[in-house]
Amino acid sequence: EDAKQAKDDFMANISHEIRTPLNSIIGIGSELLDAKVDDTTKEQLYDITVAGRNLMSLVSDILDFSELENDTMELVEEPYNITSVINDVVNMAHVWNKEKNLEIIVDCEADIPNNLLGDSQKIYRIILNLINNAIKFTDAGGVILFVGARKESYGINLMVKVKDTGIGMSEKNIDALENTYNQVDTTRDRRAGGIGLGLAISRKMIAKMNGHMHIESVPDAGTTVSIIIPQRVLTDMPLVSVRDAGDKKIIFY
């Protein structure tokens, strides 16, 4: 028990130590993006900034793994803008997709309330993990991100579906995701450069938020991951749909 606690403390401490220089890299990169530089330099700065955020996401995965294993993860309920969350995910997907040049389609229902109450960072991380996984294991074809909502007495069920035309998974590999730290298929993950945390951590995070994940997959044909997460709606604010969210537009392409 003491050894396990020491390991968990080490993981938490080292993760926090890594965050400090990463935040500096991301912050400086973001500031330089606003400076007057040529297009090539701006693109390089953008790639550095996004790569830093990507690495920060990996560090967060390590922290999440530790918190989930020890049942110490806390949810932060705060107002957030679902449009901003989806835009941030799509911006990251652009970077991941540069080399593969897959077709990425974003399909958002028009009547999703934009003023939600929940843990926006975890919602972002979950959707980001799904997109990352889809791009990582797809070499040809494309990825579709669907976002919708269904009204409930407590607010809405946020519905997200990510469908890809990638290498797929067997039923055995899908079942293996119940184990938080499981690479699903060592050869498969090594080929894609992953460590196998994304889907498994997302599933446990979704369960903690009283939601659920469903995976349908056919080897060599593709995978569809569907999630439903209950979210409250801020009824004391004007209801703004995703499609009418002012200057913060969802990116469709």
Q: What residue ranges belong to the model's regions?
A:
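Primarily the dimerization/phosphotransfer
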Residues: E1-D34, R53
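Conserved catalytic submotifs in the C-terminal HATPase_c
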Residues: V76-N81, K98, E103-N114
